[in-house]
């Protein structure tokens, strides 16, 4: 048998050069062992870091399983609840904050804590916030974010007939149970409008006026004694009981693309053609001072700025008597805004002879049904919701067509001087829901504010100077209740409107008169949990009472300083119905002294 031949070669002997190189490497390793170990550790750390980056980033998914049936580590979802926000916790399950329902989240399926049979997932709310969230507050179905099936009315409201329209339905009282059919959208976890069922019909109500339980809906809000202050004031003049009004805190509007000046220094302009047609002169004057805003009439009783489409539907007579064309008025407002001024549209609310001529059925009337002519005007009743719809539609159309930054409601009250009619029973307010005057005024302003906030503008209300007192006025204005609702409240404490006391004439002492008034108004501001900005009308005309004092820079400057010293720092508006440029020029030094 033939032997197998071994064809493998023996290893060749190392050359002297190779041996020296090998010895040097071994010597280096022996002398630098710690460096070698450090390099290995760094390499391992780098490899692990790369692995984390490659395999540990969130991979949002609508299911907990991937296509292979394996559980995903990171899952996208939403916060769900039957309240506007839910609590989240740290690793020891201590509550550390709240987050709004509807928030898009990513939760980690393998970072779970269990306590009392409840699972808590590590959840990322945004790039900076995270925490542990109970499993029942997490859903992957966007349609299940809102959990409530029933809500209870906290603040009486008229249901909206449609989510996208002004028409109002029935009034629902506090504590009313409303089955939820759906909703439109969320704002910071709060439902904007619930679709609810009531009286065999569906309607809409803002989530801010509801609660999830009957107990919460009927609880009296008295934090810091807010309610107690008003409950004891009663109803001395027939305008309503202060305790029956709403003082629940409201979040004031703050629009990023419509910034209200911290201090509004405002000139007033009528909608007369000679003013609208010469608006450049007022702009030129304002730009040479520290004035930063204009108040312009949309309508002032029977003085109508332009032919709004809203008039065609609600008051054709107003449309017919418009002072300017739509294009003329629009051009004037555009010039004001293009010049950089904050622009406020003023409209009178519940004194409107044109509307009454078109709709006498909604007028305050005598017992026989004839509209009453009170204080030089006919008055639509503030109890009538159709009137509310009209004024709010007019305001919204003005915002959309003209671009106003703010809408100011003047004459947002019942007429004063009605005692003789009320005492004799010869007056009909068409009070369908048996409300007080103050309730009707506050509820109108809630409705108007909600509607106009949806348009991205602020809402103001003018009130008589008398409202700085501690009572509900006979015409339904009560400062704390109004201030709690609107964005801006504007008193009208014209010194020549104050009562003379013996030989003391308040209009001869503008600083003292306004300081005393502002101090009282500031106290009313402190009596509401979410007060409005107080921007006050000042007298910018010569006194209409003996000795007919001339009001110039000294007097106007005194009024402005008194407001500040009294604690009302939201600015002012000059009331000069003539819009006299020479008169405005006389105030220049007072305006130059503004901060």
Where in this protein do the model-derived segments appear?
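Active-site-adjacent "subsite" loops/lids of carbohydrate-active enzymes
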Residues: 253-274, 345-397
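Aromatic-lined carbohydrate-binding/catalytic grooves of carbohydrate-active enzymes
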Residues: 289-324, 416-423, 584, 591
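SH3/SH3-like (including bacterial SH3b) beta-barrel domains
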Residues: 89-101, 163-174
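SH3/SH3-like beta-barrel superfamily modules
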Residues: 100-134, 176-208
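Boundary regions of SH3-family modules and the immediately adjacent low-complexity/disordered segments
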Residues: 63-71, 124-151, 197-250
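Aromatic-lined carbohydrate-recognition surfaces of secreted/lumenal glycan-active proteins
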Residues: 342-352, 408, 437-474, 529-543
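Catalytic domains of carbohydrate-active enzymes, especially glycoside hydrolases
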Residues: 279-304, 401-406, 488, 563-571
